[in-house]
Design a protein with these regions (language model features):
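N-terminal positioning helix adjacent to the helix-turn-helix/winged-helix DNA-binding module
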Residues: 4, 11-18, 154
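Helix-turn-helix
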Residues: 14, 22-60
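Short, basic, alpha-helical segments at the C-terminal edge of helix-turn-helix-like DNA-binding modules
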Residues: 63-69
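Hydrophobic alpha-helical connector segments
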Residues: 74-101, 155
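Amphipathic alpha-helical packing segments from all-alpha helical-bundle domains
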Residues: 115-141, 152-167, 185-200
Length: 219
């Protein structure tokens, strides 16, 4: 008689869920494996069985982020107007928020985790390619008029804002900026400031529509 099928590794999944919550709330450097096991009400040995080192938790979460990001960045090809762009960048910020510990502690993580050191370069490259795709789509839709020599530095500036916006929010208000109740306003501000870099190149109707979109979200 064949053995019954194995149950899903629910414990491993739950470990990642709780680890992500703790990393996002307190910052990765401030969360120990002891705290994670205590929060889960499991023994440190059980945690070690599934994830023998803290780096394995970080790497597993990063892999999930990287996969979700790859799927989302494909949507850049569908951008044709400022509303499409607004939705794209807002969704991108929502994903960044979901894994905000990576951006809150980015420099620290890169300095001590070899996988992140190498793979985050690919993340930046993929973001840059997607943002350039957004600019190309807006140009094809006649929403922006930008010379090719200006498009690359503008795209780079947009990626910089995408990458460090949550760090800026954290510096502005360390006690509350990365709490869940702050998410809506932070994401709206981030999306607007990314798109505001296109203001000099937007046609009049697109510029007015962007400001209207921001006003709708603020209200």
């Amino acid at each position: 008689m064949a053995p019954p099928p194995k149950k899903p590794r629910r414990t491993a999944e739950r470990i990642l869920e709780v680890t992500l919550e703790l990393f996002n709330r307190f910052g990765e450097p401030n969360v120990s494996t002891t705290l994670i096991s205590a929060e889960l009400k499991i023994s440190p040995g059980n945690l070690y069985y599934h994830y023998p080192a803290k780096d394995e938790l970080i790497n597993s979460l990063f892999t999930r982020y990287e996969e979700a990001l790859g799927q989302l960045l494909h949507a850049a090809d569908d951008v044709r107007n400022v509303e499409d762009a607004w939705l794209f960048f807002h969704m991108l910020f929502e994903l960044i928020w979901q894994y905000r510990f990576l951006y809150r502690d980015l420099n620290d993580l890169l300095s001590k985790n070899r996988k992140l050191e190498t793979q985050f370069q690919a993340v930046l490259k993929n973001k840059s390619h997607a943002v350039q795709g957004v600019l190309d789509g807006l140009s094809r839709g006649n929403a922006i008029h930008i010379a090719s020599r200006e498009a690359e530095p503008v795209a780079t500036a947009m990626v910089v804002v995408l990458t460090y916006w949550l760090s800026y929010e954290y510096v502005r208000d360390p006690r509350r900026a990365l709490e869940p109740e702050s998410a809506g306003a932070a994401l709206m501000r981030g999306a607007f400031h990314v798109l505001s870099l296109l203001m000099p190149y937007l046609d009049t109707a697109s510029r007015e529509h962007l400001l209207k979109l921001v006003g709708t979200y603020q209200n």
